[in-house]
């Protein structure tokens, strides 16, 4: 089954242009609907009753690593890698210091291996120093049962994490699980809030929206509210799903109905958002264009025998995105 799935996806990614009739029948209405919804900034950041009911039903099993949310538990490892790696590689190594590390104006790969290793070692040590002196604040939007929130709160360079969600049942599961680790008591808090309930004057170094935008009614509004709450230089990390055949095949057909590794009804094709649509949305407004930059976008895929892994194609299937507030 796994060989078939990977082979099928590989063929489909190379030959999607060969099925225009299929795409027209399945995706023409979806494309129009999703673009309209994404660009509608007038609605509130709430989600539908059906979405709420679906996630409320999962509350009691949220922390069962072999249960309905096991895919999220596995994805959390990739989330943490993406956040950590993005922050580290974008640190300003020689800011506010007289003891500068050498940053060559060319690729270190051109240097002899010994010199390259020394430069890399010095830079990594400086990154460690900067992070050890950091005290970052985090807002986890759509935190669910707290899988990511707890992981973020355990990072040494994070001082506080606030998780918000619209499901009281799921938040109760998060609060109960938090009590199992006394070290989280003063670093992690949960509140029943939509993001617009958080004062715009309350800013965070990191805002996360993993697997959120495809579950809300007006994703552009949610994304905008998240960006507004970033400190200058802060990061918004998100993950969602491209609206294409591969996504439908892997997440809905295979994931929900064949392999049943995701609860049926978790995903709605029309709510998927192409990564290009988010980038276009950021560029179409002059203020957003000058204030924010997309620093990285990575595709990712779930392989049942392996787990989640990054891919080199963010235009197909699931993807992660890092957006930085530059001023």
UniProtKB/Swiss-Prot annotation:
The keyword Signal does not apply. It catalyses: a 3,4-dihydroxy-5-(all-trans-polyprenyl)benzoate + S-adenosyl-L-methionine = a 4-hydroxy-3-methoxy-5-(all-trans-polyprenyl)benzoate + S-adenosyl-L-homocysteine + H(+); a 3-demethylubiquinone + S-adenosyl-L-methionine = a ubiquinone + S-adenosyl-L-homocysteine; a 3-demethylubiquinol + S-adenosyl-L-methionine = a ubiquinol + S-adenosyl-L-homocysteine + H(+). It is found in: Mitochondrion inner membrane. Signal peptide: none annotated. Disulfide bonds: none annotated. Belongs to the class I-like SAM-binding methyltransferase superfamily. UbiG/COQ3 family. This is Ubiquinone biosynthesis O-methyltransferase, mitochondrial. The gene is COQ3.
